[in-house]
């Protein structure tokens, strides 16, 4: 009884909003330590207690363990400035992901063939290879760097057995010169193509080149390949590029760097619909695979119909400029879902939605009903049903927006883990309140202080279903960490309560913004000007910022006398809240402000 009272007394210290926020992060696969740090709790013990009391673990158990691992891999992959511990955790998760898939294959083989029974005696973490009898002999010999001479096709069979139907179908169409695959999120495409390339490099000696939208995604390819080589073949791969003992090279390149066109080999282009300079990417990828023997494989979730990649997917770039091709029909979307088709331009196209993945055997990995509840129909269709965004009426250009995404590791004056992340440099805050139960957003913008600098979004925060008091306290904590000279708050409606509370501790910085057609137009034009002239940057890992901007459209008011800007409201883009939070921060900027140019000085020699 005493213990019960003690627990109750401890719980009462925290508002329901704090517990709700902890639950939200818990289900996103944050660790108790990370949740405590995120919410400013003194201890992680309440997290363990709440998880047990409110059965949060049961909610997680409804999802497959592989799905949970995949979610955590995504969370860590997108995290900037990862600590050594987080890097080790990411590598361990990839290791575990491969082991689970291998165990699943072994289970299937055990049921379907008695010959697989022998593998049941081996631990899932230390499973023997097909030729394990030679293992001790190999250890006695001097190891050759990246030696794959002992690998046989039979050793690949456990992996092949673990594939889902749609992955096997992609594998059976490996012979096509160009494969173009539009896919749902989290269906194991990176995982599969990593092994396909490794297998091909081992047995053919051909070079393999991975082109990814970011350095972090390229690292995922490499990590998968290193772990697979160790797990399936007992080989420790090192180097960048990785050069196998048979001479095959595996290159891992990001498109935000100066990619060398001197490399040649089979090309894998990852998430091509989100690459900022797609035309350059296409030129480089094609140049690397110019030789007749090289294959090209492109796969991505869809982005915008106005992104250059859409014409690559639709075949419009093949039709362009040739009257004879103008009316050549391409397979329908339904046909591409139905096993894929070889198209008139020579590309084999294939669509794998989450529904197709479930039918193909991945039903244990996903709970599609939970995903439909989590996302709006608009967001669900884009992320999981392979539907391109139609942003014809948007005031923003998707190509310009993608250029704003950068690798923030280059910002040497910003350390998000420090007590004072930006030192004493001036920053501006912007707050967009929650609407109808959706999330509130807060962003921190660093205005340029030196010639050549741009506006930078240092950080963003989203708070779901929380009270004014909680949100104001979160802003207070950030206010104490940064030299925040301005906090723009949408005080038109529900945000007024937050403004009143923030004003108590930041009277000079807090600024109430009353939304009307004139004020909204001014703020939107300021942000539009920054994007158009490439004067604003944010982390390239913040993938939902671009869709948030693309939702902003120009239309007349109900009276028809005034033009204003509106956003199509969806759950995934949080009512375009990150866009309006940025607007509220940039409101501090004058429309007439121009970027400070770098001055060039020279000394005249009068002699």
From Swiss-Prot:
Keywords: ATP-binding, Nucleotide-binding, Viral genome packaging, Viral release from host cell. InterPro entries: ATPase_terminase-su_N, P-loop_NTPase, Terminase_6C. Signal peptide: none annotated. The keyword Oxidoreductase does not apply. Pfam families: Terminase_5 (PF06056), Terminase_6C (PF17289), Terminase_6N (PF03237). One of its GO terms (molecular function) is ATP binding. To phage P2 protein P. This is Probable terminase, ATPase subunit. It comes from Haemophilus phage HP1 (strain HP1c1).
